[in-house]
Amino acid sequence: MNSKIPEDLMERAYQGKCTKEDALQLLEVPPFELFRFADELRDLAVGDTVTYVVNRNINFTSRCVGTCGFCAFRTNNGKVLSIEEIMEKVRDAEKANATEVCIQGGLLPEVGLDFYQGIAEAIKAEFPEMHIHSFSPMEVYHASRISEIPVKEALRRLKRSGLDTMPGTAAEILSDRVRKIICPSKLKTAEWVEVVRQAHAAGIPTTATMMYGHVETREERIDHMLIIRDIQKETGGITEFVPLPFMPYNNPVGEKMIREGRYATPGLEDLKIYAVSRILFHGHVDNIQASWVKLGKKLAQFSLHCGTNDLGGTLMEESISRSAGACHGEMITVDELEWMIHGAGRIPKERTTLYRRVELASGNLRKISGCGAYE
C-alpha cells in the first residue's frame, strides 16, 4: 500500500528520532493514514493490551490563590478538607479495591509542606499498600515556597512521608508565551521542568500532561511534547503521556474563545494529537493515555486505534473537568472499561500506577506482578 508518510520520516519514527518538522508534517497526513501508522507503533510498543487503573481522585479544596484563566474549579472561599475527611475518602477507595489515590487541590496561602506530608503519612499509616499519586509540580513548588525550603528538599520530605508518584499536571502548554496568557502566576516552563527533574532524581516518577486547544499554536504543541521527550531521555522517570483537550466553558479563557467563534477541539483533531503523541514518543514513553472524562467514552474507545493504550482510571469523583463543562461523568466501573476495551478488539488489563499488572489470586485477594511492557 502506498503511504503518504515519507519513508525517511517513518524510519526516524521507528528509531525514536522524529523531529519537530516531522511532527508538523504528520499533522498534514490524511487522518486515517496517520492513525494506522500510530497504531502500528502502539502495537510495537505495547501490543494489544489496553490498561486501566482502579483509583480515586480526591480534590481537597477548590480554594486557590492562583489566577489561571482556564480554571472553572477555583473559588475564593471553598472548604478545605481535613486530613480525617480525606482519609474517609481513602477508606472508601480501599473498599472499592482501588490501588491508587490521586490527591490534588488549590493553592492555599496558609498551607505549607506539613499539610501534604500529613496526608501522605496518614494514608501510609492506615493503608501502607495504597499508592499515593499526588501533588502536582505547582503544589510542590508553592508549598516549598510557603515552607521556605528548596524544592529538592520538599520532594525528599514528601518521598519520606510516603509519596509514591506525582501527577505531571500544571504543565498546560510548556511555552512561556502561552503561560503568560492563560496562567501568569503559575510556574514558568523552566520551573515546571526543574520540579519534574528533581522529582525523578528523588525517586518519584511522574506522568506528563498537555492541555491543548486554547491559545497555543500547533508548533507550541509539538515543542511541548519534545520538552517532555527530552526530560524522559535524561531521567526515564515519566510513566505516561496524557493529552487533555481544553474545556472552554465557565472560565475566562474559554468564554473569550466562544465570543470569537472558537469552541472545544473537534474529535478528529483530538485523535490526531493522540496519534502524533504516539509517534513522537515511540521508544521513549510507551504509554499514551486517553481521558474518557475529556473525550467521552466512545471517542476514547476509538482512540485505541489511533495510538493510545490506556484509558486512565475509574476516578470515583472528578470535579475539575466537570466544573469546566465536561459532561461524560466522573466515575466509570471496571466492567464498563473492560466492555469498552473488548469492543475495540483489545485485551483489558488492570494495572498499577507504575504499569504493573494487578491479578486476582486465590481467595479473591489481589496481587501485583510484572507484566512485560508495563514494568
Curated annotation (Swiss-Prot):
Cofactor(s) of this protein: [4Fe-4S] cluster
Record keywords, A-Z: 4Fe-4S, Iron, Iron-sulfur, Metal-binding, S-adenosyl-L-methionine, Transferase
CDD domains named in the record: Radical_SAM (cd01335)
Catalytic activity, reaction form: 5-amino-6-(D-ribitylamino)uracil + L-tyrosine + S-adenosyl-L-methionine = 5-amino-5-(4-hydroxybenzyl)-6-(D-ribitylimino)-5,6-dihydrouracil + 2-iminoacetate + 5'-deoxyadenosine + L-methionine + H(+)
Family designation: Belongs to the radical SAM superfamily. CofH family.
Protein role: Catalyzes the radical-mediated synthesis of 5-amino-5-(4-hydroxybenzyl)-6-(D-ribitylimino)-5,6-dihydrouracil from 5-amino-6-(D-ribitylamino)uracil and L-tyrosine.
Subunit structure as annotated in this protein's UniProt entry: Consists of two subunits, CofG and CofH.
Protein name according to UniProt: 5-amino-6-(D-ribitylamino)uracil--L-tyrosine 4-hydroxyphenyl transferase 1
